[in-house]
UniProtKB/Swiss-Prot annotation:
Keywords: Plasmid
Region (Disordered) residue spans: 474-497
Record's protein name: Uncharacterized protein pXO2-28/BXB0027/GBAA_pXO2_0027
Biased composition (Acidic residues): 488-497
Length: 497
C-alpha cells in the first residue's frame, strides 16, 4: 500500500485497508481463513510514519477522522502477533510530496484455501483536507491459481487377443501456468476396477506429461473372450501446485479380449451365420461409454440334391462390417470328401478330405470403408472331351501329361465323379485366416445328397432317377421284341455295324 499525492506538500495522509474477509463487500470469495502474516515498510525518505492496527473491522471513508486513541486501535511496534489483525491504518505524520515514497508491504497467509479463491483488497486514503473526490485509492483482486492445470479427457481400449496384451490409450489436457511446476511429479495409474488391481503405472514430471499415454495390460492379467472394466486415475499429485478439475481425476471404460472362437452353422438348419463382437470402447469424462462393433454375416442356402457326373456351384458370400472402418481380409476354403473329387485334380489332402481353396471373385467396399462384401467361388476347372477328366487351370498351364484330348470350359463347379457312391456328404466351407479384432473363424456345413447316377444300369436301385439308362444289347438282333418308338431303320443299321 503506497499513498501518492499530486500536491507539493500534503500533510497528515492516512490510508485504511483491511484483511480480506470471505463474502465481504469488496467481493472476496474464498475457502478457509486469511490472516496478516507480515508487515514491513519502505521509507527511503525517512518520513515520520506510524502503523496502527485493530483486531476488529473498522470502516470509514475518512480515515483522518478515525480516533486512534479509542475503539481498540494500537500502534504497531514490530513485535505484536499479526494473525488477529483485521484493520490496518498507515499514518504519515509528516508532509508528503509527489516524489516521496512511503510504502507499506502486507503479506497475507491463508489456511485451507483452494484454487480459484479470490481476495479483494481495498484502500481508502485521505488527508486533513476534505476532498470531494472518491476516497478509494485502489482496489486489487487476487486469485489463487495452480502452477499447472491438468485433467483426464478420454480413455479408449481396443479389443486384442489376451496373449498379445490389451492396448489402452488415455488422452488428457494440460496447461502449465508457471514453469515452477514443471518438475513436480504425477503418477498415472491403470486399475482393473472390479478388484482394484493395479495393471499399469507411469510416472511423469508435469513438464514431461504427454497429452496421450499408452498402456498395455499384461497378458498375465487377461483371459480369452473376457470383459473387464478398467479405470485410469491421477494419483500422488502435489495439490499445493497442481489443480485437477472436479471429476477429471479418473475415467473408466470396458476392455474386451478377442473371443478367438469358431462360429459354426449348418445350411440345413439355418439361413444365416452371424457373429457380432466388440472391437473398441471409449469414454469421455462425464459422458456415457461408447461401444464399437464388428459383424460377420454369411447367408446360407442349401445345396440342391445332385446326380453323379453333374456340376454344381459352391458360391459363398460374406459381409464384414467394422464400425471403425478397419479393413480385414477373408480367406476361404472347402473340405470335401475325396469321393466327390475327380482323381485327376491335384488338390491338397487335409484332415482326411480334399482341400479346395475358394477364390475371391468379387469384393465391394462401401464409401465409408465400414462394409466389405466378398464373394468366393470354386476354382475354374477344365473338362477333357471323351474322358470327362477334370483339370485345374494351373494343370493346363503346366501341360499336365494326362491331358490327351481337347478341353471344354467346366466353369467354377464341383463335379461328382460319374461312379461316385450315392448318399449324404458334408462339405465344410471354412475361413483360413482369423477375421477381425476378435480373431474369429467360421465353419459352414453344407450337406449334399447324391441321389442318382448319370448312367443308370440294370439293377440300379435308383433307376427311375438315373439320368441315362445303359443296357447291353446283341447288335445282330438288338430289338427282338420290335423296334422301339423313335428309332429309324438307319439307326438300327448303325447299331448293327
Amino acid at each position: 500500500m503506497q499513498p501518492y499525492t499530486t500536491v507539493k506538500d500534503e500533510a497528515h495522509v492516512k490510508a485504511l485497508t483491511h484483511v480480506p474477509r470471505n463474502k465481504d463487500e469488496n467481493g472476496s470469495a474464498f475457502h478457509g481463513v486469511t490472516f496478516l502474516k507480515q508487515l514491513t515498510m519502505d521509507n527511503p525518505n525517512h518520513k515520520n510514519v506510524e502503523i496502527w492496527l485493530n483486531n476488529s473491522f473498522i470502516e470509514s471513508n475518512n480515515p483522518n477522522k478515525i480516533d486512534l486513541q479509542s475503539n481498540g486501535w494500537y500502534r504497531y511496534t514490530g513485535e505484536q502477533d499479526l494473525s488477529k489483525v483485521v484493520s490496518i491504518l498507515l499514518y504519515i505524520n509528516d508532509s508528503l510530496s509527489s516524489s516521496d515514497v512511503a510504502k507499506m508491504n502486507l503479506v497475507y497467509g491463508t489456511h485451507k484455501n483452494g484454487f480459484g479463491d479470490q481476495y479483494v483488497s481495498k484502500t481508502v486514503v485521505n488527508t486533513s483536507v476534505d476532498y470531494k473526490l472518491s476516497p478509494i485509492s485502489n482496489q486489487v483482486r487476487y486469485t489463487i491459481v495452480a502452477n499447472a492445470n491438468i485433467g483426464l479427457r478420454k480413455i479408449r481400449i481396443d479389443t486384442a487377443p489376451a496373449e498379445s496384451g490389451l492396448p489402452v490409450t488415455v488422452r488428457l489436457d494440460k496447461d502449465i501456468v508457471y514453469e515452477d511446476s514443471s518438475k513436480d511429479e504425477i503418477t498415472v495409474n491403470l486399475y482393473d476396477k472390479a478388484d482394484n488391481r493395479l495393471v499399469g503405472s507411469k510416472v511423469y514430471t508435469i513438464g514431461e506429461l504427454p497429452e496421450e499415454i499408452k498402456f498395455k495390460v499384461d497378458r498375465k492379467f487377461l483371459k480369452k473372450k473376457s470383459k473387464r472394466n478398467y479405470e485410469v486415475r491421477f494419483e500422488k499429485i502435489n495439490k499445493e501446485s497442481i489443480f485437477v478439475a472436479e471429476g477429471k481425476n479418473k475415467v473408466d471404460t470396458d476392455g474386451y479380449t478377442s473371443s478367438e472362437e469358431t462360429v459354426k452353422a449348418n445350411s440345413k438348419e439355418s439361413t444365416e451365420l452371424k457373429y457380432k463382437g466388440v472391437i473398441m470402447t471409449e469414454r469421455e469424462v462425464g459422458k456415457e461409454m461408447e461401444v464399437f462393433h464388428e459383424t460377420l454375416t454369411i447367408p446360407l442356402k442349401q445345396l440342391p440334391k445332385q446326380k453323379t457326373g453333374y456340376g454344381f456351384e459352391l458360391k459363398t458370400e460374406a459381409s464384414y462390417n467394422n464400425e471403425l472402418a478397419v479393413p480385414y481380409d477373408i480367406k476361404v476354403g472347402a473340405l470335401i470328401d475325396k469321393k466327390l473329387i475327380d482323381s485327376h485334380l491335384n488338390y491338397e489332402q487335409k484332415e482326411g478330405n480334399t482341400y479346395v481353396p475358394l477364390e475371391e471373385t468379387n469384393k465391394n467396399i462401401s464409401s465409408d470403408k465400414r462394409n466389405n462384401d466378398f464373394t468366393f467361388e470354386l476354382p475354374h476347372v477344365n473338362v477333357e472331351q471323351k474322358t470327362g477328366a477334370l483339370f485345374t487351370d494351373q494343370q493346363v498351364k503346366d501341360k499336365d501329361s494326362r491331358i490327351k484330348n481337347a478341353l471344354k470350359d467346366g466353369k467354377r463347379k464341383l463335379y461328382a465323379p460319374i461312379w461316385a457312391d450315392l448318399g449324404d456328404y458334408n462339405i465344410f466351407v471354412k475361413s483360413e485366416l482369423p477375421i477381425g479384432a476378435n480373431k474369429v473363424n467360421f465353419e459352414v456345413t453344407q450337406p449334399l445328397h447324391v441321389y442318382a447316377f448319370m448312367y443308370g444300369t440294370i439293377g440300379s436301385d435308383t433307376l427311375k432317377d438315373d439320368e441315362i439308362l445303359v443296357e447291353p444289347v446283341d447288335p445282330r438282333n438288338p430289338f427282338s421284341n420290335g423296334k422301339p418308338s423313335g428309332w429309324s431303320d438307319e439307326d438300327v443299321a448303325w447299331l448293327k455295324r
